[in-house]
Amino acid sequence: MASSHQGNGTVPNSQTDAPPDSSTKRRWRRNRIACDSCHARRVRCDRQFPCSRCLRSEITCEFTRERRKRGRIARSKLAEMAKNKMETSETPAPAKTMNGIPAPAGTEIPGHVSPASTFHHRSPPANAPTVSAPSVDGRRSQTDPQLPVRRPEIGGNVTEEWLAGTHVSPGSYEFLNGPAFGEGLGPFPHMFDVWNGVDLAAYSAGTSQGSKATNAPSTSTAPLKYPVLQPLMPFVEATLPRKLVFDLLDLYFTSAFSTHMHPVSFLSKDAPRPSSPALLSSMLWVAALDDRAFSLPISPPQRKRICQFLCALTIRLLRPLIHVSFKDQGGAAAAVAAAAAAATNNPAFAGVGQDLPPTTVHHPFEGGGDDRGLVGPAGSLDDVITYIHVASIISSSEQKAASMRWWHAAFTLARELKLNQEIEVMPNGDSQVEGSSPPFGYSLPGWDGADPGPVFNYSNPTRSSLNCVCDRQDQNTITEEHREERRRTWWLLYIMDRHLALCYNRPLALLDAESEDLLLPLDEASWQSGIIHSNSPKSDGPQCLLSADKNKRRLFPNFICHDHSVFGFFLPLMTITGELIDLNQARNHPMLGMRLNGKDAWNVHVSEVLRQLEIYKASLTTFAATTSDPEAPLSAYAHAQSEHLPAEPSLSQAYAWHTQTVISYASYLVHVLHILLVGKWDPVSLIEDKDFWTSSPAFASTISHALDAADSVDQILRYDPDISFMPYFFGIQLLQGSFLLLLIVERLQKEAGEGILNACEVMIRATESCVVTLNTEYQRNFRQVMRSAVAQARGRPVNHSEIRHRRKAVLALYRWTRKGTGLAL
């Protein structure tokens, strides 16, 4: 047994502990007597009790671990240990001790922890124990005691201390590719392994034999800078320093993902928004992947491990398509471990779950779902937003086809929760109706779960209780902020559905017909300043008694650009894009396409889309004229973000710059929609030209739009050189706007004019900027194709047949034909 050392300067007797001779340089040996704190963080200890790291962190420096021999533990000894554990659990002592150290009052030493649990435990108990750190030989200690709680020194940099540890040992944190996930299983699963269906329980179930859990609380008693993070801290505090978590949350609200949520509610210290741990984890994950995360004091390898940890944690907390709270998972984890022991006959699983009473084994879907136990609870709005975060991250990677399973989950859950309908607030909250958001029933220390909030009724959308609740202060009623958050989430999904349909050549999932009763999103200035009213111009819609005829909301469909936000200028364009997608799907239909081509009904539809584009172009001109003088809109803009904006001259310049950026992007998108309306979407069919479309008047009309689109891209590069304003949406638009220029250069070769070649050069520069900001394979491939075509047109000697064959092979990867899948390889 190891002796305890409470910072009194005594250390275990060992040959490796002797001081080095001053005349000879001592050979460094494996440090087997690191203090508990350094051992837990996997950092080098100077072996001076108290050590320098503990002194800097103001924590107790002690050595209480059992020192045992290296090598595997005999199976007979494992079975004996499990048997002894079962016997001790049957006769619990009033106060347990561990290695001579009495257990803290009010805490309970867990009898046994399921090896099949993941992320500390499958069901975090009320005291949230954490898994003990691996010992020197790579295994977790058999009886690791409670680890000292780190307290950051006043004025010190906790992030620097944490990063110093990870620099010394890349496996400092077992969740960041550390060795604590078992022998023979390799490192922690990569991000795409999780998305491809890897069960995280396998990584935890394969941990070293005889693994235990300590009784150390994973949360500190210090107040949080952002109390909204309280539900998440038990899961991340043992791995990520608080300062880094706070910085990531701040960074999230400067990203493009935060448009559908209210930053003030999340960052409030008095009344933070009740949020699920999965949503909070996904927000940190989004921020960690943002390019601006490099401004944080973390190295790229550390950033990668942080992203992997937050990825797996988000999936673990989200429980996709199940959405079962953790409070019922203790028995379920024991049942899984018992089944694993029976199936594998592994002594390491012996006795798992024996100390749990039979009543703790609940069905995972108990209290929700159908009577056969096949369908789980619906989920909540937070789950939908979490799906959006996960799906967006995958869409921006090379795994684009895999992202659709997450997008479909978001679409389905949003429709199941009826986010496309104005909700009615029921006066009594005794029972929840079907489709409402369940409360967050996570059992975490110091957090009894978020307030289940109001109860919604979707049965009759014409009731008077649809009216604005801006004058109500009752906590049991839904707030206008939450109603607006639901609307913005639905419209964001609406935008993404059109974007994905254009990217992957698939039909629409969210229809215009099911969106027409929902109010359009509030303008950005009112949303950021918290001036929210549900005041519909329609008599059967929500009415605001306080606003009367003021603050009237916009109705769907709307084809007018009215502000700088993605909902203000991009949503009308995506509404028009949806009609183009319907037209293209009908054109490619095996039967309808032949019947409708050239018919009057088809021409009427094309004329209607042209009318909508003209309405948007006129509104864009008005928007540019009204925002050129920043006096009127500037006051509202400054009121919305007065705490985050610079002085007045800088504010005016930033506002004008933002306006020009929006106008440049919107102008380009209008030209691309013109090309998509009368042109061809598939690059191979465009180049082959089997139907002689290049000889038609439609081709001549699209050339001018292609050149004007290149001019708009030149303006975009002036105001947004790195294409960071809307990188997730712009890539496919840039690709479709470049196909026609590629065709012209391919046909004319050296006869192409300088104007055409300059337009191609602009498109190449924009594509290169996209590659830097959001690196994807299709952009790299198209850049090479476009660059070779321009070089050939400028006189580079090449083998024409060979280079044309290579271009066609690359373009054939991305087809928008009847069977094509677009960018989804």
Swiss-Prot record:
Q: Name one GO biological process term.
A: regulation of carbon utilization
Query: Where is this gene product found?
Result: Nucleus
Q: What is its main location?
A: nucleus
- Polar residues bias locations: 1-17
Q: Which cysteines are joined by disulfide bonds?
A: none
| Source domain of life | Eukaryota
Which GO molecular function annotations are given, in alphabetical order? DNA binding; DNA-binding transcription factor activity, RNA polymerase II-specific; zinc ion binding
Is Cytoplasm given among the entry's keywords? no
Entry's InterPro entries? Transcription_factor_dom_fun (IPR007219), XlnR/Xlr1 (IPR051439), Zn2-C6_fun-type_DNA-bd_sf (IPR036864), Zn2Cys6_DnaBD (IPR001138)
Please give the SMART domains that the UniProt record associates with this protein. Fungal_trans (SM00906), GAL4 (SM00066)
Q: Where is this region: Disordered?
A: 1-28, 117-152
| Record-linked CDD domains | fungal_TF_MHR, GAL4
Q: What happens when the gene is disrupted?
A: Impairs growth on L-arabinose, but only a small growth reduction on L-arabitol.
- GO CC annotation terms, alphabetical: nucleus
Q: Point out the DNA-binding stretch(es).
A: 35-61
- UniProtKB keywords: DNA-binding, Metal-binding, Nucleus, Transcription, Transcription regulation, Zinc
| Similarity annotation | Belongs to the xlnR/xlr1 family. araR subfamily.
Give the protein's function. Answer: Transcriptional activator of the arabinanolytic system. Involved in the regulation of extracellular arabinanolytic genes and in the regulation of the intracellular activities of L-arabinose catabolic genes in the pentose catabolic pathway (PCP) in response to the presence of L-arabinose.
- This protein is called Arabinolytic transcriptional activator araR
